[in-house]
Amino acid sequence: MRDQREEEENLLEDEEQIELLLEEANAYGLRIEVEQWAIQLLKEDPNLSRLEAYVQAYNEWIK
């Protein structure tokens, strides 16, 4: 039970971080590009975490 709660909290934190990345990308007018890039990364590597995919996509587009 405790592990499940911790996992849910971690997932929520990841989603919050992803949203912050997307908001920052939006400030550059690149939210859609970052989102699409992250989705492509996840298709290419299903073992990649959602957060890591969005971080990589953000870093690729926001240089």
Residue ranges and their predicted role:
Residues R2-K63:
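C-terminal alpha-helical interaction appendages
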